[in-house]
Design a protein with these regions (language model features):
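RNase H-like two-metal-ion nuclease catalytic core shared by retroviral integrases
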Residues: 70, 118-119, 146-168, 180
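Short, basic/hydrophobic alpha-helical segments
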Residues: 94-114
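Active-site proximal helix-loop segment of RNase H-like, two-metal nucleases, encompassing DDE(D)
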Residues: 83, 159-178, 192-194
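C-terminal domain-tail junction helix/linker
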Residues: 5-6, 46, 181-225
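Mobile genetic element proteins and their domesticated derivatives, centered on retroelements
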Residues: 34-36, 75, 81, 100, ...
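RNase H-like polynucleotidyl transferase catalytic core
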Residues: 59-64, 136-158, 174-176
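Extended, low-complexity cationic-aromatic segments
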Residues: 15-101, 213-216
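Acidic/histidine-rich, metal-coordinating catalytic segments
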Residues: 111-124
Length: 225
Protein backbone atom coordinates (compact mmCIF):
# COMPACT_ATOMS: atom_id res chain seq x y z
CA UNK A 1 0.00 0.00 0.00
CA UNK A 2 1.29 3.45 -0.87
CA UNK A 3 1.49 5.92 1.98
CA UNK A 4 1.50 9.52 0.77
CA UNK A 5 1.34 11.86 3.74
CA UNK A 6 1.31 15.12 1.79
CA UNK A 7 1.74 15.65 -1.93
CA UNK A 8 3.71 18.87 -1.62
CA UNK A 9 6.31 20.37 -3.96
CA UNK A 10 9.19 18.49 -2.32
CA UNK A 11 7.40 15.15 -2.60
CA UNK A 12 6.59 15.73 -6.27
CA UNK A 13 10.14 16.85 -7.08
CA UNK A 14 11.70 13.74 -5.53
CA UNK A 15 9.02 11.49 -7.01
CA UNK A 16 9.69 12.83 -10.49
CA UNK A 17 13.44 12.63 -10.00
CA UNK A 18 13.40 8.95 -9.04
CA UNK A 19 10.91 7.99 -11.75
CA UNK A 20 12.90 9.89 -14.39
CA UNK A 21 15.93 7.88 -13.32
CA UNK A 22 14.05 4.60 -13.73
CA UNK A 23 12.82 5.62 -17.19
CA UNK A 24 16.32 6.19 -18.55
CA UNK A 25 17.72 3.61 -20.97
CA UNK A 26 20.34 1.34 -19.49
CA UNK A 27 23.77 2.94 -19.30
CA UNK A 28 26.60 0.66 -18.10
CA UNK A 29 28.75 3.68 -17.21
CA UNK A 30 25.96 5.14 -15.05
CA UNK A 31 24.39 2.18 -13.23
CA UNK A 32 21.23 2.72 -11.19
CA UNK A 33 21.54 0.96 -7.83
CA UNK A 34 18.86 0.78 -5.12
CA UNK A 35 19.59 0.14 -1.44
CA UNK A 36 17.35 -0.59 1.53
CA UNK A 37 17.62 -2.55 4.77
CA UNK A 38 15.46 -4.52 7.19
CA UNK A 39 15.96 -6.21 10.57
CA UNK A 40 15.82 -9.99 10.80
CA UNK A 41 14.92 -11.92 13.96
CA UNK A 42 17.11 -14.95 14.67
CA UNK A 43 15.38 -18.03 16.09
CA UNK A 44 16.54 -21.51 17.04
CA UNK A 45 14.50 -24.69 17.40
CA UNK A 46 14.07 -25.87 20.99
CA UNK A 47 13.51 -29.43 19.78
CA UNK A 48 14.58 -30.92 16.45
CA UNK A 49 11.88 -31.18 13.82
CA UNK A 50 10.89 -34.21 11.80
CA UNK A 51 12.02 -34.29 8.17
CA UNK A 52 9.58 -35.01 5.38
CA UNK A 53 9.14 -38.63 4.30
CA UNK A 54 6.89 -40.38 1.80
CA UNK A 55 3.30 -39.63 2.69
CA UNK A 56 4.20 -37.26 5.51
CA UNK A 57 5.05 -33.55 5.60
CA UNK A 58 7.95 -32.16 7.56
CA UNK A 59 6.99 -31.13 11.09
CA UNK A 60 8.39 -28.43 13.33
CA UNK A 61 7.64 -27.67 16.96
CA UNK A 62 5.93 -24.34 17.58
CA UNK A 63 8.30 -23.50 20.41
CA UNK A 64 11.52 -21.67 19.57
CA UNK A 65 14.33 -19.77 21.28
CA UNK A 66 15.11 -16.14 20.46
CA UNK A 67 18.71 -15.58 19.38
CA UNK A 68 18.75 -11.82 18.91
CA UNK A 69 18.50 -9.88 15.69
CA UNK A 70 20.56 -9.16 12.59
CA UNK A 71 20.13 -6.95 9.54
CA UNK A 72 19.94 -7.33 5.78
CA UNK A 73 21.13 -4.67 3.35
CA UNK A 74 19.37 -5.28 0.04
CA UNK A 75 21.35 -3.78 -2.82
CA UNK A 76 20.27 -4.30 -6.42
CA UNK A 77 20.92 -2.92 -9.89
CA UNK A 78 17.44 -3.66 -11.28
CA UNK A 79 18.12 -3.14 -15.00
CA UNK A 80 21.21 -5.34 -15.09
CA UNK A 81 20.06 -7.98 -12.62
CA UNK A 82 23.03 -7.52 -10.28
CA UNK A 83 22.48 -8.31 -6.61
CA UNK A 84 24.67 -7.40 -3.64
CA UNK A 85 22.55 -8.40 -0.63
CA UNK A 86 24.51 -8.57 2.60
CA UNK A 87 23.69 -9.76 6.13
CA UNK A 88 25.22 -7.67 8.93
CA UNK A 89 25.06 -7.68 12.74
CA UNK A 90 23.11 -4.44 12.80
CA UNK A 91 21.89 -1.47 10.80
CA UNK A 92 24.58 0.99 11.80
CA UNK A 93 26.36 3.83 10.05
CA UNK A 94 29.54 1.76 9.99
CA UNK A 95 27.85 -1.17 8.29
CA UNK A 96 26.24 1.17 5.77
CA UNK A 97 29.64 2.70 5.00
CA UNK A 98 31.19 -0.69 4.34
CA UNK A 99 28.31 -1.72 2.08
CA UNK A 100 28.73 1.50 0.06
CA UNK A 101 32.48 0.86 -0.21
CA UNK A 102 31.78 -2.57 -1.70
CA UNK A 103 29.14 -1.23 -4.09
CA UNK A 104 31.52 1.41 -5.43
CA UNK A 105 34.26 -1.22 -5.82
CA UNK A 106 31.89 -3.29 -7.98
CA UNK A 107 31.74 -0.49 -10.60
CA UNK A 108 35.35 0.61 -11.19
CA UNK A 109 34.62 1.94 -14.71
CA UNK A 110 31.44 3.86 -13.85
CA UNK A 111 31.44 7.62 -14.39
CA UNK A 112 28.91 7.86 -11.57
CA UNK A 113 26.71 5.42 -9.67
CA UNK A 114 23.12 6.57 -9.29
CA UNK A 115 22.09 5.43 -5.82
CA UNK A 116 18.45 5.41 -4.69
CA UNK A 117 18.02 5.72 -0.91
CA UNK A 118 15.30 6.55 1.57
CA UNK A 119 15.72 9.20 4.26
CA UNK A 120 17.17 7.06 7.05
CA UNK A 121 19.61 9.12 9.10
CA UNK A 122 22.62 6.89 8.30
CA UNK A 123 22.17 7.35 4.53
CA UNK A 124 24.60 10.24 4.26
CA UNK A 125 28.20 11.18 3.57
CA UNK A 126 28.93 11.54 7.30
CA UNK A 127 28.51 7.79 7.80
CA UNK A 128 31.35 7.22 5.34
CA UNK A 129 33.70 9.89 6.65
CA UNK A 130 33.12 8.87 10.28
CA UNK A 131 33.88 5.20 9.69
CA UNK A 132 36.20 5.10 6.68
CA UNK A 133 38.09 8.32 7.24
CA UNK A 134 37.56 11.82 5.90
CA UNK A 135 39.52 11.39 2.69
CA UNK A 136 38.29 7.91 1.78
CA UNK A 137 34.71 8.69 2.75
CA UNK A 138 34.54 11.84 0.64
CA UNK A 139 36.14 10.08 -2.32
CA UNK A 140 33.54 7.30 -2.18
CA UNK A 141 30.64 9.74 -1.82
CA UNK A 142 31.83 11.66 -4.88
CA UNK A 143 31.45 8.46 -6.93
CA UNK A 144 27.72 8.55 -6.19
CA UNK A 145 24.79 10.58 -7.48
CA UNK A 146 22.27 10.10 -4.69
CA UNK A 147 18.52 10.19 -5.32
CA UNK A 148 16.47 10.32 -2.13
CA UNK A 149 12.90 9.09 -2.18
CA UNK A 150 10.31 11.47 -0.69
CA UNK A 151 9.38 11.12 2.97
CA UNK A 152 6.75 8.38 3.16
CA UNK A 153 7.79 7.49 -0.37
CA UNK A 154 10.07 4.52 0.23
CA UNK A 155 7.76 2.48 -2.04
CA UNK A 156 9.65 4.19 -4.87
CA UNK A 157 12.82 2.33 -3.90
CA UNK A 158 13.12 -0.88 -5.92
CA UNK A 159 15.25 -2.34 -3.13
CA UNK A 160 11.95 -2.89 -1.28
CA UNK A 161 11.03 -5.34 -4.05
CA UNK A 162 14.42 -6.96 -3.55
CA UNK A 163 13.69 -7.37 0.17
CA UNK A 164 10.40 -9.03 -0.72
CA UNK A 165 12.18 -11.45 -3.05
CA UNK A 166 14.72 -12.29 -0.34
CA UNK A 167 11.97 -12.85 2.22
CA UNK A 168 10.12 -15.27 -0.07
CA UNK A 169 12.97 -16.98 -1.92
CA UNK A 170 15.74 -17.00 0.68
CA UNK A 171 14.41 -16.68 4.22
CA UNK A 172 10.97 -18.23 3.86
CA UNK A 173 9.57 -19.59 7.12
CA UNK A 174 12.79 -21.25 8.22
CA UNK A 175 14.44 -20.51 11.54
CA UNK A 176 17.97 -19.16 11.34
CA UNK A 177 19.74 -19.08 14.67
CA UNK A 178 23.01 -17.30 13.87
CA UNK A 179 24.38 -14.49 11.73
CA UNK A 180 26.79 -16.95 10.10
CA UNK A 181 23.84 -19.02 8.86
CA UNK A 182 22.01 -15.92 7.63
CA UNK A 183 25.13 -14.82 5.77
CA UNK A 184 25.59 -18.17 4.06
CA UNK A 185 21.95 -18.20 2.95
CA UNK A 186 22.02 -14.65 1.57
CA UNK A 187 25.29 -15.30 -0.24
CA UNK A 188 23.80 -18.39 -1.85
CA UNK A 189 20.73 -16.39 -2.89
CA UNK A 190 22.95 -13.66 -4.39
CA UNK A 191 24.82 -16.27 -6.39
CA UNK A 192 21.62 -17.76 -7.80
CA UNK A 193 20.06 -14.38 -8.60
CA UNK A 194 23.23 -13.12 -10.29
CA UNK A 195 23.59 -16.31 -12.31
CA UNK A 196 20.03 -15.88 -13.57
CA UNK A 197 20.42 -12.11 -14.04
CA UNK A 198 17.15 -11.68 -12.16
CA UNK A 199 15.83 -8.24 -13.13
CA UNK A 200 13.10 -6.08 -11.65
CA UNK A 201 10.60 -4.78 -14.20
CA UNK A 202 9.45 -1.36 -13.00
CA UNK A 203 6.39 -0.02 -14.87
CA UNK A 204 5.27 3.01 -12.83
CA UNK A 205 6.24 6.12 -14.82
CA UNK A 206 6.05 9.88 -14.36
CA UNK A 207 3.08 9.96 -16.70
CA UNK A 208 1.24 7.40 -14.58
CA UNK A 209 2.18 9.25 -11.40
CA UNK A 210 0.67 12.50 -12.68
CA UNK A 211 -2.59 10.70 -13.42
CA UNK A 212 -2.56 8.67 -10.20
CA UNK A 213 -1.88 11.61 -7.89
CA UNK A 214 -3.59 14.28 -9.96
CA UNK A 215 -0.82 16.84 -10.35
CA UNK A 216 0.72 18.66 -13.28
CA UNK A 217 4.42 18.65 -13.95
CA UNK A 218 6.03 21.77 -12.56
CA UNK A 219 8.55 23.26 -15.03
CA UNK A 220 10.96 23.73 -12.12
CA UNK A 221 10.69 20.09 -11.02
CA UNK A 222 14.10 18.49 -10.95
CA UNK A 223 14.55 15.51 -13.24
CA UNK A 224 17.46 13.76 -14.89
CA UNK A 225 16.60 12.51 -18.36
Amino acid sequence: MWCVAELDADYIAKLEDVLALYERPYRPTEPVVCLDEKPVSLHADVRPGRPARPGHLAKRDNEYRRCGTANIFAVVEPQAGRHFTRATPDRSAGQFARVIRDVVAAYPAARTIHLVLDNLNIHCEKSLTDHLGERAGRALWRRLTVHYTPKHGSWLNQAEIELSLIARQCLGTRRLAALTHLRSETRAWNTRANRRHTRIRWTFTRKKARVKFGYQRNPSTRSRT
